[in-house]
């Protein structure tokens, strides 16, 4: 049997895996256990009551967290004309059409989000094999294919998170950094849960949000008692 590290022993002794923690208690515990030499992200896993094998029950979308994610996001935008100027004014680091596509084909991938206006999809479509595996392909379902590219850039910069359930019906995303104020993490979590509720497939039956767990980059998962969250989110 593998020997537990000191960090793993502390987590084992501090975290009750059978308990659902009040949100404030959960965040305090995460902060206590976050001992890495960098500022860890606070990640969330939401188990949904869906049948992920059925395409009409899959959940996908995006929402802007009220307090952002704490990450600096670099944005590439495929567009032209007035939209190109608007994207630059909104803070996009890379803006173009065929010229931007050529950069990407050469392996120049210095961005975290790709946005495209509908008329640019003829160019972006050629990059599916490059952008797709990295989760960067623009998609109207998450607001990254839009005629209003400036708004999409603003959302990305403001802390928009994208979510999509995995094959087990679980959503994985981040809600901030461990050095965020506890109330900001709580409000970010509540905003995400509200967005997930709005995205509930009509075919999903029974309990929809079955379990919510928080963890830090290097830490263990802590189950959250949903009754302590804002009524709109639970």
From Swiss-Prot:
HAMAP family: Ribosomal_uL1_B (MF_01318_B). This is Large ribosomal subunit protein uL1. Binds directly to 23S rRNA. The L1 stalk is quite mobile in the ribosome, and is involved in E site tRNA release. Protein L1 is also a translational repressor protein, it controls the translation of the L11 operon by binding to its mRNA. Part of the 50S ribosomal subunit. It comes from Pectobacterium carotovorum subsp. carotovorum (strain PC1). Keywords: Repressor, Ribonucleoprotein, Ribosomal protein, RNA-binding, rRNA-binding, Translation regulation, tRNA-binding. NCBIfam families: rplA_bact (TIGR01169). GO terms for molecular function: rRNA binding; structural constituent of ribosome; tRNA binding. GO terms for cellular component: cytosolic large ribosomal subunit.
